[in-house]
From Swiss-Prot:
Region Disordered, residue ranges: 176-199
Organism: Pongo abelii (Sumatran orangutan)
First and last residues of every Calponin-like repeat: 174-199
Protein name in the entry: Transgelin-3
Keywords for this protein: Phosphoprotein
Lineage of origin: Eukaryota, Metazoa, Chordata, Craniata, Vertebrata
Amino acid sequence: MANRGPSYGSSREVQEKIEQKYDADLENKLVDWIILQCAEDIEHPPPGRAHFQKWLMDGTVLCKLINSLYPPGQEPIPKISESKMAFKQMEQISQFLKAAETYGVRTTDIFQTVDLWEGKDMAAVQRTLMALGSVAVTKDDGCYRGEPSWFHRKAQQNRRGFSEEQLRQGQNVIGLQMGSNKGASQAGMTGYGMPRQIM
């Protein structure tokens, strides 16, 4: 965490709960996908939360990832800077987040820049990358590289059309309880405030 002291008390408890949500197996899967998706000479980071954060922190890997999900010539981030200046790196992270939202990732699935930059919530970073992968698999536009089973396919609209005749036939169906006096009823129910009669 940059320029931030340790947290104490309830802040520490909250931070520990957030850190418990981080998934090391998911990290490996995401790293493999990012390297395969970008198809560039991207170095594989050592395992661990701190290394994963450092690998993504400058924003270049994230920008290359979002650009690789678009056809050539339509990349949303035309210039990727490899600057070591903090504000340039944070700007690249925010460019990635805007491009991910434009791509189709829901706002609720997008992490805050400080979650990655300060390492506050790396689980949120993982959730964003998972959501991005799910949208890419669902779009199925030929730009996704990787195993389709790595991410969940989002549900898509499947409208059904019924003819007038089918709707009329549905009105002729008799419900199973129509005309029956058996099954669930309110017989034996007492009103509120009345004592139970035990004999």
